[in-house]
Amino acid sequence: MIGFGIYVTASLFLFDRSEYENYLSPFYSPPVGFPEWLPTWLTPAVFVLWIPLGFRATCYYYRKAYYRSFFWDPPACSSKAQQREPRSPENYRGETALFVLNNIHRYFLYGSLIVLVFLWYDTALAFLPQGSFGISLGSIIFLINVSLISAYTLSCHSLRHLIGGQVDCYSCVTGGNARRKAYNWLSVLNRQHALWAWLSLFSLLITDIYVRLLLAGAITDLRIL
């Protein structure tokens, strides 16, 4: 997680190019204009990247991971681990002060769903070099990446709750049957939410690094079809 944050920060300030032919780095999607009044050491990604980063930083799974890893709070959920808890139970105050901002996770979800649409659009373009259909190593990497990001986003606990978590009687609400099926499908995805979180994190890095290597001329894109 720390390494990912360092890499993303470096991308914001050190790399001024994000596109190679029909490949756009996922960190820069959707592409936005760059106002002239902003300093040149910034990149357009600053207008976009805060959405998926905020979504991950406030994610229920990632919160559990960094609370345990960085703060040892709590160390785990077992009774023995709770006995090693560094603070007494009566002093627990939940997520307060700065961490209360984690409650805006749902709003980051809305923004991430919009970004996801653009990522799928970018993936479609990756299969259309010079305007005609083609398959290459890069397009496959893009497809795997957006599929993993989709699995992570759609397995979100907040999305699952929005679809059907607050419904006690599906037959009593409009579209209840469709919501029930969607809720059950999202529940299947949700069981592996932690797995999707890590796989999509690494796929983002791999996809961006692949574009960077192409831009640097270090590698060539392998054309398959």
Task: Locate the predicted segments by residue.
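Membrane-embedded alpha-helical bundles that constitute the cytochrome b-like, heme-associated redox core
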Residues: M1-L225
